[in-house]
């Protein structure tokens, strides 16, 4: 944890420091301009290795950990004395006065809540759904809420609409625990957590105990996370549209830097009206930067778990694991690693790729690699593509299918072609692709501890990855 005591302005400064520390330590701002006594936390999930330590598993097998938990949900339990409701504001609500809202760049549309977990209860099944949606603050008690096509929250809203109701009671929870964040950060439709699946049960399985919830103070039918830092109670108003940026244009101007790496477009979306703000004593405001690894890690892990679950059903003998590279931006692509045992396993990498592409609707690219590849290292994956890929027989372009709009192929309707690259060596010719194995040495014995440390500091992550492996 990196603690910063100098004053930090939520306008541009906090986001700029968060961006500059991307992939590094978690950062706690202790002196937030305009909000005495308030703290802001970011980059908690910026490191995959750190997430793996939280879960007590090897980083390569985080997908298995999540997939197993999804099949053994632990139901949430209701409590009456929730820490997240220790302080409640139900009159004279002013979001900007209570919450240290951030603006990331000068080109942004305004101040945006990026870490608000929307908890909604399905009015038909009673299952809890959790999802993140960017929320530009419009007034003292109103924000936009951007809900992409295909999101389960949109389907829940449609159920309310079908019942003749224009308002969807929800809570927006900031600063939920790691298990809740991992269970609810899937970006869109994925087979592991289909519509009607209770995602708080998933979170309970991840943390080994039920998630605690409390009835909202001002919204019947809504529940707050009892352990959240901050909660905005309110309702989504389906009868009220508002533009995310002041000109009122739809899909023309930039909104803020998004997970795909570009400025996200501003749209006309539903509004969210805040009817109460509750929070812990001395709460900390969690601020994930959408473009940072913190967000793409949280988006990517549920996608990995969904692909892992699908692929192990297709061929548990050959499939090893899977991972989203940082450049794949959370859920736009996946690397799957296989280990064929005999000539009869040849071709299963292709079946696994088809399963991976179907397990998550946003998935646009899949690359299959052999068991000797470090799937977390983009250089090693690219080496496999270059040295083992056969672009005549090992490249597939699908017909038009559902993909993310963040892909270059993706249209406004979410249509595009999916891409698969077989970057595995032919099993029958595997001896041609044997890597050299050198003897292990302790550089400190040869160079001294200080010089050895200097060498390691200069080596790239790719070289460190290669030297750490014994084929």
Task: Give the positions of each predicted feature.
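Extended, highly charged
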Residues: 1-271, 275-471
């Amino acid at each position: 944890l990196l603690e910063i005591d100098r004053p930090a302005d939520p306008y541009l400064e906090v986001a700029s420091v968060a961006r500059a520390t991307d992939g590094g330590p978690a950062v706690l701002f202790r002196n937030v301009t305009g909000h005495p006594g308030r703290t802001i936390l970011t980059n908690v999930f910026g490191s995959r290795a750190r997430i793996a330590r939280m879960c007590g598993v090897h980083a390569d097998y985080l997908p298995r950990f999540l997939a197993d938990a999804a099949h053994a949900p632990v139901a949430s339990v209701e409590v009456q004395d929730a820490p997240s409701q220790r302080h409640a504001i139900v009159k004279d609500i002013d979001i900007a006065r209570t919450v240290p809202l951030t603006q990331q760049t000068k080109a942004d549309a305004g101040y945006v809540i990026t870490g608000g977990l929307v908890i909604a209860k399905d009015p038909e099944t009673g299952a809890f759904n959790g999802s993140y949606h960017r929320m530009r603050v419009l007034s003292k008690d109103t924000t936009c809420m951007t809900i992409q096509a295909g999101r389960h929250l949109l389907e829940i809203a449609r159920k309310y609409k079908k019942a003749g109701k224009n308002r969807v009671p929800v809570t927006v929870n900031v600063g939920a625990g790691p298990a809740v964040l991992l269970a609810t950060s899937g970006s869109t439709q994925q087979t592991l957590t289909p519509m009607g699946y209770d995602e708080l049960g998933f979170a309970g399985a991840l943390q080994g105990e039920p998630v605690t919830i409390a009835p909202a103070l001002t919204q019947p039918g809504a529940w707050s996370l009892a352990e959240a830092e901050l909660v905005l109670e309110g309702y989504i108003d389906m009868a009220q549209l508002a533009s995310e940026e002041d000109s009122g244009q739809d899909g023309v101007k930039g909104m803020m830097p998004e997970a795909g790496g570009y400025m996200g477009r501003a749209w006309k979306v539903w509004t969210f009206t805040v009817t109460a703000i509750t929070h812990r004593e001395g709460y900390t405001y969690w601020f994930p930067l959408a473009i940072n690894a913190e967000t793409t890690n949280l988006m990517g892990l549920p996608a990995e778990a969904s692909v892992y679950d699908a692929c192990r059903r297709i061929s548990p003998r050959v499939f090893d694991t899977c991972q989203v590279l940082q450049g794949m931006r959370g859920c736009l692509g996946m690397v799957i690693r296989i280990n064929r045992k005999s000539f009869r396993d040849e071709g299963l990498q292709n079946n696994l790729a088809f399963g991976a592409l179907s397990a998550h609707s946003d998935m646009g690219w899949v690359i299959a690699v052999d068991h000797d590849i470090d799937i977390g290292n983009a250089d090693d994956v690219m080496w496999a593509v270059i040295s083992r890929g056969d672009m005549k027989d090992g490249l597939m372009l699908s017909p038009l299918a559902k993909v993310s709009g963040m892909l270059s192929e993706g249209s406004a309707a979410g249509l595009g072609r999916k891409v698969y690259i077989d970057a595995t060596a032919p099993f029958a010719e595997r001896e041609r692709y044997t890597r050299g194995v050198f003897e292990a040495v302790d550089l400190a014995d040869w160079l001294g501890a200080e010089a050895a440390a200097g060498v390691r500091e200069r080596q790239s992550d790719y070289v460190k990855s290669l030297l750490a492996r014994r084929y």
